[in-house]
């Protein structure tokens, strides 16, 4: 073997066999540190969850090497016979999980899935209705800073000021006055049950499509803990992470064959090129997990834990927007503790409790300050926390916020936060992740 060939072989051996730690210790170190953070912190961000090792393996597989523009059986590249199997499994499992006739599993994100529906069903300048961001909606539901708010005429609906519940009379009135082409239901910070039937009645009355973005509650729908929008909506979108516990990505469901064709064309070639086959594999695995009986117990535990956390926080003098929760999340009004969301997020973070600042309905504070935090139970429930643990977590949160109130500064109360941090590390140590003990 020549020196050149030997060098090429050695280089090839390194390329195919060397570990990440050997090739890129900086990235390896960042990932290792993030794993440590996840192991030793309590994750309360409502949109986050923890995937199984099987999902990690699928998403980190050699499927990342394969281009597969098009759909199963109709690809623009050769060599797709095995990725076709993967995508077909994902589609069939999604349809079974949600009782839908059609599923597109290619959207790369929640924003892109919603954009694809707009591309399929609307024209620039058309009117659609969506939940106001300040009432718990999403950027893609018509926020002026988002494409959805720039390309379309948006009419926003909201919650009532007295009880922070959806004002369905207002939805009906706005629909009659504005004759939208599409009504979008669903949100990112609404803790109560959605009345899909009433939304469909309003949509039918004005001749609008009903689109439901169930990204946050899809796992609860799949687990039987929230009414399904699929029988009522013309089209449903959902992310595949959050309460569904899969990889980060999106999905679109419908029971209408004509809409399905428009959706498929909007996703590809309208919005995306080659799908991420390794992510679709992860989606398929997560859907299979969600079809198992134990996922129904998981979904029930998510809701039970959220209610326990909300009640514990209320017992410590905090206000919960709308008075409580029917799903996986809650908005905590911090004003009784004279705290802002910005300060609370930072203080809780120093105590190893991760959450996000969040505006509350009719919030007097600026969006980057806020009067509230949003808390969710999917990740902690995946980890194994039950009602007892979430009551303890609620008490720890109150302890930090009380310390913050005494300190009355951005720096917080170091002694209280350190004491809580030690309790958090002890708690998380009892619920190891990915086979790790300690």
Swiss-Prot record:
This protein's name: Serine hydroxymethyltransferase
Subunit structure: Homodimer.
Function statement: Catalyzes the reversible interconversion of serine and glycine with tetrahydrofolate (THF) serving as the one-carbon carrier. This reaction serves as the major source of one-carbon groups required for the biosynthesis of purines, thymidylate, methionine, and other important biomolecules. Also exhibits THF-independent aldolase activity toward beta-hydroxyamino acids, producing glycine and aldehydes, via a retro-aldol mechanism.
Cofactor entry: pyridoxal 5'-phosphate
GO CC field: cytosol
Locations listed in the record: Cytoplasm
Associated pathway: One-carbon metabolism; tetrahydrofolate interconversion; Amino-acid biosynthesis; glycine biosynthesis; glycine from L-serine: step 1/1
Reactions the enzyme catalyzes: (6R)-5,10-methylene-5,6,7,8-tetrahydrofolate + glycine + H2O = (6S)-5,6,7,8-tetrahydrofolate + L-serine
Binding site for (6S)-5,6,7,8-tetrahydrofolate: 133, 137-139
Residues at the site labelled Plays an important role in substrate specificity: 241
Family statement: Belongs to the SHMT family.
EC top class named in words: transferase
EC number from the UniProt entry: 2.1.2.1
Any GO MF annotation of the entry: glycine hydroxymethyltransferase activity
Gene3D superfamilies: Aspartate Aminotransferase, domain 1 (3.90.1150.10), Type I PLP-dependent aspartate aminotransferase-like (Major domain) (3.40.640.10)
Any one GO biological process: glycine biosynthetic process from serine
Gene: glyA
Pfam families registered for this protein in UniProt: SHMT
PANTHER family referenced in this protein's UniProt entry, alphabetically: SERINE HYDROXYMETHYLTRANSFERASE, SERINE HYDROXYMETHYLTRANSFERASE 1
In-chain residues carrying the UniProt-annotated modification N6-(pyridoxal phosphate)lysine: 242
Alphabetical keyword list: Amino-acid biosynthesis, Cytoplasm, One-carbon metabolism, Pyridoxal phosphate, Transferase
